[in-house]
Amino acid sequence: MNTNIANQLRAAKKATTDLNLIQSDTRTIILKTLAANLEKHIENIIQENQKDLSLMLEQDPRYDRLLLNKERILSLVNDVRKVANLPNPLGVNLFEKSMPNGLSIKKITVPLGVIAVIYESRPNVTIDIFSLCFKSGNVCILKGGKEAHFTNSYLLLLIKNTLKNFNINTDIVCLLPPERALMTQLLNATGLVDLCIPRGSQNLINFVRDNAKIPVIETGAGIVHTYFDKSGDLGKGKKIINNAKTRRVSVCNALDTLIIHADRLKDLPELVETLSQKNVIIYADQDAYHVLDKNYPEQLLIKAKPQDFGHEFLDYKLAIKTVPNIKAAIDHIQQFSSHHSEAVIAEDESAIDKFLTEVDAAAVYANASTAFTDGGEFGLGAEIGISTQKVHARGPMGLEALTSYKWVIRGTGQIRD
């Protein structure tokens, strides 16, 4: 292992003791101070962000994720304040029992320890991760992408300056160099890192899962479907589909495939009408193509190929699949889903119940946009990632997901027979 990286990880592990000694009220004050510092230095953050943006083509799908403007920074500041004001997740009593032999047994929440997060493009993640880890008593190792190097480095400087003002050990957070070659060393850091969370492309997530010797929670990649049922309301459908697809195409909760009941194909042109205003390219199956031909801009309509389904576009592109019934819709989702976010638009309660019960995803929606799959929108303040697995955490991961528990047993000299 690279000596410098090894030293950083050892220092981070050692710093867990110092972090555990910081009282909850102090952690809250420090986070509020960080929020104020971020707000104070908005122009400097934008300047550093522009350095990163200048090295990327504006047409690159990552460009929007990399961009930090005043509005996004203020939203980030607000998220930090929300996290600061959340209840302390540590020391929560999950179970308590007095045994017949006099033993008192409790199960209480504790930090996970050292959390490494590997992420791409989005520098706002740097602040989200630190605020959640700090509030939950976890040391964080940040491994951002080279495309956000200037922005991440400046954000880390603001974090460390805030900690120094409170005489806090700054080893509780570190930003590793962006070189990809260092990733394997991090993934092999058994005994130093307690959990790794990859946030980014499917290729990144696959690499981490396949090469890690430390525990991993998979997050990110979203192959998202919305099913418009036979009973779907046209007005709701138009708004939901447009929002889920075009609000922010570069995020993991953006719509990738619209599934439509065959009996509602006549309404398809109206359902997707507003998408043409955003130049959304539609990859339509045979039935959908036949209906949209002459009813959607010719240059934006393409006959779908098999590979267009089960694809995370992260762009102004949408696949459309026609099905004869809700069972076929669910079967299609189960075949291609990444188990992130899936939605149904329906008025028939039995159809809604069937969809919400049978679809296997971290977040399932009825008559709402999948754009809501987000820690802030779920009342978590922020998120460290959106887990697409079932063990330990699932869906947006807030403070609770960053804790484990330990058993505390008090006795008066008891021994076991």
Swiss-Prot record:
The places in or outside the cell where this protein is found are: Cytoplasm
Q: In which pathway does it act?
A: Amino-acid biosynthesis; L-proline biosynthesis; L-glutamate 5-semialdehyde from L-glutamate: step 2/2
Annotated Gene Ontology MF terms?
glutamate-5-semialdehyde dehydrogenase activity; NADP binding
Reaction catalyzed: L-glutamate 5-semialdehyde + phosphate + NADP(+) = L-glutamyl 5-phosphate + NADPH + H(+)
Q: Which Gene Ontology CC terms are recorded?
A: cytoplasm
| Chief location category | cytoplasm
Q: What is this protein called?
A: Gamma-glutamyl phosphate reductase
Stated family: Belongs to the gamma-glutamyl phosphate reductase family.
Q: EC number(s) for this protein?
A: 1.2.1.41
A GO BP entry: L-proline biosynthetic process
What is the organism of origin for this protein?
Legionella pneumophila subsp. pneumophila (strain Philadelphia 1 / ATCC 33152 / DSM 7513)
Q: Which NCBIfam families match?
A: PRK00197.1, proA
UniProt-listed InterPro entries: Ald_DH/histidinol_DH, Ald_DH_C, Ald_DH_N, G-glutamylP_reductase_CS, Glu-5-SA_DH, GPR_dom
Enzymatic class: oxidoreductase
What does this gene product do?
Catalyzes the NADPH-dependent reduction of L-glutamate 5-phosphate into L-glutamate 5-semialdehyde and phosphate. The product spontaneously undergoes cyclization to form 1-pyrroline-5-carboxylate.
